[in-house]
């Protein structure tokens, strides 16, 4: 019974870290395919980003910081055993988002980007910043469950930083409308992600509890009288 209980509790952790491993692979892929121009001065993409290269660098460094610290924020072990570290990482995450999100909105609504995505960029960057700060206000008010939900939502918007670039692995070019549709879809998914994740987690716990109850009942029936 103890081993089955441990395996049931380990199941969500396995899913969580498998997800983060997949995201790590996505990050490496995006860095190689889409961000390689940083180490290649002859890359023609430099001409496109030249007017905002320092802002882009600031946005990128802050975004990577949010991505890394946000991942560690999801560690239940750090939350349990290293509370001070968890809080420090949370503050670094908030600071990184506070820097990166407004810069993203500024660049995303400039003439460097297609008209079709400029309005979306306000929502994407705005929700990213808003959800991070709501998560912070919730934890300062002692509302742990609300903090968790808003932190998941904020981190989902952080992942857009990576996932929106994945199509570049397969397509060298696509329409402005295609980019807009993809980004709006990610905004919607990011907005509802806490409900999806927390609902799935709750249903998994219920299923595991019922399975343990059935095994316990079966063991009781087989016990010697």
Where in this protein do the model-derived segments appear?
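Alpha-helical membrane insertion/targeting regions
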Residues: 2-225
